Amino acid sequence: AGVEAEYVQIGATAMDEPCPYAVIIDRISHEVPYYRTYLKHAAIQGATVVNNPFMWTADDKFFEATLATKLGIASPKTVVLPNREYIPGIKHDESLRNLRYPLDWQGIIDYVGLPCVLKDALGGGWRDVYVCRSIDEVIHHYNGSGLLTMVLQEFVQWDHFVRCVALGQRDVLPIKYDPRERRYHVEHEHMSPELGSRVVEDSLKLVRALGYDMNSMEWAVRDGVPYAIDFMNPAPDMDIHSLTPHYFDWVVKAMADMTINLAKNPRPQVREAGWAQLFAGSRHGGAVPDGSSAPVPA
């Protein structure tokens, strides 16, 4: 295909150093801050980074809940909570003068309902996720959250669960998934045509708004309605033992096709902000201030 692939090699990067790569696939910068800093540099230098490091840096689960709501996609009721603890130097009577406290826990619970899910707004991999069945459970886990920013979310009592792998803002693979077992099921006709179409269309709407070329999203289906309960997974689990060999083969091929296409057909990322384009008209009369537009794949 005329494309070479290798592991990226970087270290002590200079500000004017060119990036030797056309495309970089990032699956680790959320754990290694230096990599994230380098990837923003690489994007400015002209590389296509999967996923866009500027969007990934700005993303969180509460933003995504707000985004889904604005896009008209069914999403569980969600509240972001003030941090339970703060770094040294934060003076509660000065630094937190803008914060309403104590929290109205009963009002919060009345909004999201019980049971509900308390989770880290920036978390993943099922870390710091708690299903709470009483207000006391919510407060208990919140009190143990430390410096994390937590969101409290309505628990959707689902009768069907789907996890989609979305690649290249074009291809979506909806897989039957059981979060209780944390296991995929190889069952190709697990949704009606109508439900399947809606899940795929809503998944594409979300990844195009976020500008993510590699993501997974979880849909809890209740009474035939798919609710987007988690779609902040820019480094999704792609292990063969998780996906099963059948779906793993699909993901590998789709990832390879996407990467080769991006190498041969570069797509500038520095000015991409898919979600901003969707809402530009609400404050600027339908036009982005400088008249620019971000490309959205067909």
Regions found by a protein language model. Give the residues of each.
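Short, solvent-exposed loop/turn segments at secondary-structure junctions
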Residues: H30-E31, W56, L122-G124, Q157-W158, ...
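A structural preference for short, hydrophobic beta-strand core positions in alpha/beta folds
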Residues: Y7-V8, N51, K77-V80, S216
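A short, polar/charged loop-to-alpha-helix boundary motif
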Residues: R182-H188, M238-P245
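Beta-strand scaffold of nucleotide-dependent catalytic cores
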Residues: H140-H141, V151-Q153, F161-D178, Y227-M232
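A long amphipathic alpha-helix within ATP-dependent nucleotide-binding catalytic cores
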Residues: G146, R182-P226, W250-G291
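Active-site nucleotide/adenylate-binding loops and adjacent lid/helix of ATP-dependent enzymes
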Residues: A43-G46, F54-F161, P193, S197-E201
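ATP-binding N-terminal substructure of ATP-dependent carboxylate-amine bond-forming enzymes
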Residues: A1-V50, F54-D59, F63, V296-A298
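A short beta-strand motif that forms the metal-chelation/ATP-contact edge
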Residues: Y21-I25, C164-A166, V225-I240
